[in-house]
Amino acid sequence: MYTGRFAPSPTGLLHIGSLLTAVASYADARSNGGKWLVRMEDLDPPREMPGAASHILHTLEAFGFKWDGEVTYQSRRYALYEETLYRLKTAGLVYPCHCNRKDWQAGARRGTDGFVYNGRCRHPGQRPALQGKQPSWRIRVPDRDIGFSDGIVGSYAQNLARDIGDFVLFRADGYWAYQLAVVADDAEQGVTHIVRGQDLLVSTPRQIYLQQCLGVPTPQYAHLPLLTNAQGQKWSKQTLAPALDLNRREQLLRQVFRYLKLPEAPETDRPAELLDWAVAHWDMDKVPKHAITAP
C-alpha cells in the first residue's frame, strides 16, 4: 500500500514552500488511495522555535489536511536510532570520528553538499586524541555512483566518495544526524513514496546507501521545485518567508495549485473541499521541474 509522509521541522512556522510540499505529498498519497503520515523532525532542540510543533499541526488542520495515525516525533524515537546505529557498528560499516570540524574543513575540498571529509579517522592509527569528548560516528561510503529515477527530476546520481565523503550519523554534541533518523523512520513506518523539496535531492543518494546497508526497501522519490523570492533565494525561514496567514487559506491554496499546474478549482471557502479538488485532479507529470519565483 502507498504510504507517504509530510515531515516538517519545528525550527519555524509553515510558509508557502511548506504548503506546496504538504499539498503535493497529500494529493499524491490520496490520489493513489494511500496513507499520509505526519512526522515532526525535532532532532535539533537548540534550533527549534518554542511552540512551533503545535502551531504547525494547528495550521495543517486549518488548511483541511487529515493525516493517518498519530503524529510521530523524532525526539521520542532515540531507541530506534540507537538500534540502527548498533546494526551498522556490528556490520563494521561505521567508525568513531574524533576530528574537530574547523580543523578538518580547513584543508578539505568542496563537494556537492559542503566540504568532503578527508577520511582521517577511517584509520585508527591516524585518529587524533579524543581529549575527553565523545566522538561523532561516520559511515564509510563507496567509490561508486548511487543513483535513482526521480518522479519529477528524472535520473540523478552521486559518487558518494567523491561528492560527499564519509558522512555523520551521530553528532559529537550528542544529537542524531538527519540522514540516519530519516532512513530509520521511513523504514519503520513503511513509507513507500516520498514527495519533498529539491533542496533534499542532494541527500537522497546518502539515504539510499543507508537503506542498502540496512537491507530496507528504498521508497520512490519525487522532488518538488523550490519556491524562490525575487532574489532567487529559496523561500525558507532563513530568507524570512512569512508564516502562512490563516485568514487567507483559500487564496494560498489556490496560489499553490497554480504552482503545481492544477486546474482552476471551483469557488468554495472550505479548504478541505479545495484539497479534495487537488486530489481528484492531481497529475505529477505536470509539476514543473525547475524553481518557481513566488512573490
Swiss-Prot record:
One annotated GO molecular function: ATP binding
| Motif 'KMSKS' region: positions | 234-238
The EC number(s) attached to this protein equal: 6.1.1.-
Q: Tell me if Lyase is a UniProt keyword of this record.
A: no
Question: Would the keyword Lyase turn up in this protein's UniProt record?
Answer: no
Which family is this sequence assigned to? Belongs to the class-I aminoacyl-tRNA synthetase family. GluQ subfamily.
Q: What is this protein called?
A: Glutamyl-Q tRNA(Asp) synthetase
- What organism, scientifically named, is this protein from? Neisseria gonorrhoeae (strain ATCC 700825 / FA 1090)
What is the organism lineage in this UniProt record?
Bacteria, Pseudomonadati, Pseudomonadota, Betaproteobacteria, Neisseriales
